[in-house]
């Protein structure tokens, strides 16, 4: 178990860490294995859970978008280790490989994929709040019986789960600070933070809360 921590859904749900054998690793650097390898492992785990008749929630963190931005050679037209743009393009490549494989699986039709950046408290430095560094995309993919749409609202990562649960039409009780961004009464705002400061942003104005 991952340090005994539970899940956002229930303390009864435990986080299990999966080790990856060396034979399943084609490329790695100081941060970990390449995106293709971790996605392949995710599919293997999903296959086993489906075969065993168990639902699954797989959480994956990719490593390519970290310095020195290295990844397997011959995958894209930007040499490994030269730029962040190359790392992002490789991740795009790896995601395409993931979805090409996932679509062939029997569990795909009942599986929702969420892709989002994982900005941490230090992403904008220790002191200044650089708003541009917190502007990130999020994708909700393969949501059953939902039409594609592009949402351009000022919101935060904390709003992700309430929005997803709303799309599922789930009724639940929680201590979430986030809100459903698709709700008619959603008030646009964003929370930003570093190790030292927490800020609230509304439209073009930013207020330091602490």
Where are these regions (language model features)?
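Solvent-exposed soluble domains appended to multi-pass membrane proteins
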Residues: 1-210
């Amino acid at each position: 178990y991952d340090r005994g921590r539970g899940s956002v859904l229930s303390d009864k749900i435990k986080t299990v860490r999966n080790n990856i054998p060396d034979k399943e690793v084609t490329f790695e650097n100081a941060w970990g294995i390449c995106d293709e390898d971790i996605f392949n492992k995710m599919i293997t785990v999903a296959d086993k859970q489906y075969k065993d008749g168990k639902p699954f929630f797989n959480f994956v963190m990719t490593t390519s978008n970290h310095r020195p931005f290295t990844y397997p050679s011959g995958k894209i037209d930007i040499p490994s280790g030269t730029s962040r743009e190359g790392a992002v393009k490789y991740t795009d490549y790896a995601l395409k490989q993931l979805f090409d494989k996932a679509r062939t699986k029997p569990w795909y039709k009942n599986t929702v994929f969420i892709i989002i950046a994982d900005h941490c408290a230090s992403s904008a430095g220790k002191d200044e709040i650089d708003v541009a560094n917190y502007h990130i995309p999020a994708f909700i993919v393969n949501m059953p019986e939902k039409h594609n749409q592009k949402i351009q609202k000022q919101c935060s990562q904390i709003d992700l789960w309430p929005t997803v649960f709303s799309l599922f039409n789930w009724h639940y009780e929680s201590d979430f600070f986030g809100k459903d961004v698709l709700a008619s009464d959603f008030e646009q705002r964003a929370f930003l933070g570093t190790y030292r400061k927490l800020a609230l942003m509304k439209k073009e104005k930013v207020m330091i809360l602490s």
